[in-house]
């Protein structure tokens, strides 16, 4: 469906409102599937999809859906392994670009991990999951929060199964995390050990007397700890026990026996010794991590396609959740043959709008006794809501053609080919503006098809007399072609004389309140020319005025009421 003039701006504002509510960028792509269309079957299909989706999507899922993001499996080159293959397999293996490849066994010695298809090292096939299973495991591990969120949205699904498999590799990740922080762990243990040894020395000193105490203090001041520990073997045993205990704690978390602390005081591990230990552990962990990843990835691979589908489905559910929020208290409009209307429609661009009921074309029994007309002239008070009503009509018609619910208690519409909306341009006047506006109206009226044309005060850019003649003829042509037209005009009486087939409605300012402010009922009265605002403004000035000013205003007011 084609949107012309200010109808495009209304659509952009509706889209902007929706997009601002969508926090996940990937979910915004679903909006593109709901561009306004003139295909009746497509509109019905969209309505059915949204009816089902909005009914089933749960508000409590939002917390989990907002945690969803893409899980990206990056391609990486591994320098810690080499793949030994037959001459025939070299080209295929090199194309994978995952690690160094050779067919010469003499080139494999310096690598921690030796993979092979010809009987050396770890037996593999030439495929990514065998050569670099970490490429699958690491991204999944790093995105456990996404998997956990998906498991809440789709219990028992692919994410759930992958999380169960990842638990088998959890211990290795913990070891690797400890390895990264090994320097800090050892330094902390050093401090802890030295503090405990100092405490033991102090306590032990209190048990000594006489010559033993003198010898102890002399050796301690001289730093002759070897003599001290040799002389006092019980103390030595206690300190060795503390060191062994500290090493066991580190060994337990690393899963490998470690002897790193010197049997001396103060305990201090040289940095080069820590680095040597880290290199040794890294080598062992890489092999362990590879083997466990290889085993785990075989269980995970069958679920990856389903996982991808779950992520896309989660974006779709989030999109539906946003639409559900946006369209709360909306209604799906009924598709009819000849009419556009709504009961208690609410303008989405106005805060706390007054609900309004209106129609053009057939009313389908919703407005008994009201004249049905394809051409409607809307008259009445300035600032009474006439332009807002045109805006509301365009909102409802655009949303309806998107397949969306609309802001009303009840609504119906004819599937259109085009919507034209000519909003009043308050700062544009003169011959140029008149010519441009007239050309725009002629473009709207020409051609065939189902059209809705919304016009806001065409007469404001030319003389009222000329405007009445031009509009009358244009509206006759629109009537002959079966177009729907709602035009805001102060020329209701003049136009009604020229085109009796049109219905004239009015928005009335009811009067003045106790503070002399205008009271406006934004619900149009059908078949009634709206009472103009100028009369009420004159009345307000007459009631406020004094002396001669009041007398003049009262004389003007009498002219209105003759």
From Swiss-Prot:
Keywords: ATP-binding, DNA-binding, Hydrolase, Nucleotide-binding. SUPFAM superfamilies: P-loop containing nucleoside triphosphate hydrolases (SSF52540). Divalent metal cation. Highest activity with cobalt or manganese. Gene3D superfamilies: P-loop containing nucleotide triphosphate hydrolases. It holds the Pfam family MutS_V. Optimum temperature is 90 degrees Celsius for ATPase and DNA-binding activities. GO terms for molecular function: ATP binding; ATP-dependent DNA damage sensor activity; hydrolase activity; mismatched DNA binding. The keyword Thylakoid does not apply. Its cofactor is Co(2+); Mn(2+). SMART domains: MUTSac. Transmembrane segments: none annotated. ATP binds at residues 380-387. GO terms for biological process: mismatch repair. The keyword DNA-binding applies. Multimer. Belongs to the DNA mismatch repair MutS family. Archaeal Muts2 subfamily. Has ATPase and non-specific DNA-binding activities. May be involved in recombination and/or recombinational repair. Not involved in mismatch repair. This is DNA-binding protein MutS2. It comes from Pyrococcus furiosus (strain ATCC 43587 / DSM 3638 / JCM 8422 / Vc1). The lineage of its organism: Archaea, Methanobacteriati, Methanobacteriota, Thermococci, Thermococcales.
């Amino acid at each position: 469906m084609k949107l012309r003039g200010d109808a495009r701006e209304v659509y952009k504002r509706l889209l902007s409102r929706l997009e601002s509510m969508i926090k996940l960028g990937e979910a915004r792509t679903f909006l593109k599937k709901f561009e306004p269309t003139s295909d009746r079957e497509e509109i019905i299909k969209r309505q059915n999809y949204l009816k089902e989706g909005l009914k089933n999507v749960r508000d409590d899922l939002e917390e989990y859906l907002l945690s969803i993001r893409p899980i990206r499996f990056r391609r990486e080159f591994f320098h810690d392994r080499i793949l030994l293959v037959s001459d025939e397999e070299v080209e295929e293996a090199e194309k994978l670009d995952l690690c160094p490849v050779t067919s010469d066994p003499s080139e494999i010695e310096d690598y921690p991990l030796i993979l092979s298809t010809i009987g050396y090292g770890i037996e593999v096939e030439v495929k990514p999951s065998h050569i670099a299973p970490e490429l699958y495991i690491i991204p999944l591990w790093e995105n456990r929060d996404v998997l956990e969120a998906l498991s809440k949205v789709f219990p028992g699904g692919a994410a759930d199964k992958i999380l169960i498999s990842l638990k088998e590799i959890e211990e290795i990740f913990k070891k690797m995390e400890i390895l990264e922080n090994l320097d800090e762990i050892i330094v902390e243990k050093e401090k802890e050990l030295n503090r405990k040894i100092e405490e033991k020395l102090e306590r032990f000193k209190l048990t000594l007397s006489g010559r033993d105490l003198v010898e102890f203090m002399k050796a301690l001041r001289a730093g002759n700890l070897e003599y001290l520990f040799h002389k006092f073997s019980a103390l030595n045993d206690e300190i060795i026990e503390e060191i062994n205990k500290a090493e066991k704690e580190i060994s337990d978390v690393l899963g490998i026996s470690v002897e790193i602390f010197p049997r001396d005081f103060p305990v201090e591990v040289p940095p080069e010794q820590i680095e040597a230990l880290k290199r040794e552990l890294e080598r062992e962990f890489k092999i362990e991590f590879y083997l466990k990843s290889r085993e785990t990835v075989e269980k995970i691979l069958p679920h990856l396609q389903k996982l991808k589908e779950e992520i896309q489905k989660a974006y779709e559910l989030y999109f539906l959740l946003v639409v559900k929020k946006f369209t709360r208290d909306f209604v799906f409009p009924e598709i009819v043959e000849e009419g556009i209307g709504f009961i208690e429609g609410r303008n989405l661009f106005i805060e706390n709008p007054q609900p309004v009921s209106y129609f053009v074309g057939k009313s389908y029994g919703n407005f008994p006794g009201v004249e049905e007309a394809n051409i409607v002239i809307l008259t009445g008070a300035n600032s009474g809501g006439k332009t807002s009503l045109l805006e509301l009509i365009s909102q409802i018609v655009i949303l309806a053609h998107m397949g969306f619910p609309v802001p009303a208690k009840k609504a119906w519409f004819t599937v259109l080919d085009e919507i034209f909306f000519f909003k009043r341009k308050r700062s544009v006047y003169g011959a140029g503006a008149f010519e441009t506006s007239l050309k725009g109206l002629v473009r709207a009226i020409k051609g065939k098809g189902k059209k809705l044309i919304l016009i806001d005060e065409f007469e404001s850019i030319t003389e009222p007399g000329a405007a009445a003649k031009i509009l009358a003829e244009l509206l006759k042509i629109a009537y002959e072609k079966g177009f729907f037209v709602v035009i805001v005009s102060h020329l209701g009486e003049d136009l009604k004389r020229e085109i009796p087939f049109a219905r004239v409605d009015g928005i009335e300012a009811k009067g003045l309140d106790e503070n002399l402010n205008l009271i406006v009922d934004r619900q149009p009265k059908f078949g009634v020319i709206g009472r103009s605002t100028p009369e009420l403004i004159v009345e307000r000035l007459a009631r406020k005025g004094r002396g001669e000013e009041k007398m003049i205003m009262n004389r003007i007011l009498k002219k209105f009421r003759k």
